[in-house]
Swiss-Prot record:
GO cellular component: cytoplasm
Upper classification of the organism: Bacteria, Bacillati, Bacillota, Bacilli, Bacillales
HAMAP family assigned to the protein according to its UniProt record, in alphabetical order: Deglycase_HchA
Entry's EC annotation: 3.1.2.-, 3.5.1.-, 3.5.1.124
Biological source species: Staphylococcus aureus (strain Newman)
Catalysed reactions, as listed in the record: N(omega)-(1-hydroxy-2-oxopropyl)-L-arginyl-[protein] + H2O = lactate + L-arginyl-[protein] + H(+); N(6)-(1-hydroxy-2-oxopropyl)-L-lysyl-[protein] + H2O = lactate + L-lysyl-[protein] + H(+); S-(1-hydroxy-2-oxopropyl)-L-cysteinyl-[protein] + H2O = lactate + L-cysteinyl-[protein] + H(+); N(omega)-(1-hydroxy-2-oxoethyl)-L-arginyl-[protein] + H2O = L-arginyl-[protein] + glycolate + H(+)
Protein name (database record): Protein/nucleic acid deglycase HchA
GO molecular function: glyoxalase III activity; protein deglycase activity; thiolester hydrolase activity
Name of encoding gene: hchA
Hydrolase is among the record's keywords: yes
Amino acid sequence: MSQDVNELSKQPTPDKAEDNAFFPSPYSLSQYTAPKTDFDGVEHKGAYKDGKWKVLMIAAEERYVLLENGKMFSTGNHPVEMLLPLHHLMEAGFDVDVATLSGYPVKLELWAMPTEDEAVISTYNKLKEKLKQPKKLADVIKNELGPDSDYLSVFIPGGHAAVVGISESEDVQQTLDWALDNDRFIVTLCHGPAALLSAGINREKSPLEGYSVCVFPDSLDEGANIEIGYLPGRLKWLVADLLTKQGLKVVNDDMTGRTLKDRKLLTGDSPLASNELGKLAVNEMLNAIQNK
């Protein structure tokens, strides 16, 4: 007989690979994960056939987020937030390159993998080798960025690991500068917009000041995520709060699957936005190619 959801523990689960580190509680996973997503088909299968334009994904290589109380959250990139948007992009005909800050393997929250979702699982299997052996972002900047680069968009998936390193990386700053200067897309969701903070490093103001974004609500990281044991403590800083302080406009305070386009910046509020953000990115990229 299956266990009643209300009987599941709200205590975070210890991660035995690291001192004082924790996975989300069983109860929180029952609320936040599912075997399938809301994927409802690809709208533009094979629509892009020329083979030039690609997507550069900046993924997380660090698993642990140190919290205010000294505990660590065992995280990574959220598999739905990464793989469902990429499924739409790859099925439309765009190749994907994977980079991390140091070239170390990508870390994923496998506990959030929708194991019965063919779209997500098939994309994971196609990308697994690149996820294990990604490019080093500094090498991409040196060798593959410029006005003639083949990258049409930069994609930064979420998961709490996006708050570690990426938000204060000068390499990420250079990549975002390149995207803005060369009229390329920046696509990100949930905690991924933490990467946008890098644009303001050592500057009086961020080049993204005035842009509107969707982002994971700070209120959940401060409240429900702790109460149900998803997080084992409070984050040292909050994504929407710091984005607002850099002059960006956060348009949501809840988690509904909302997406937003502001110029070439495409954002989503949570894993619930993954499917629609993938569709939005494909539509915008195809339109941009037609108008080039």
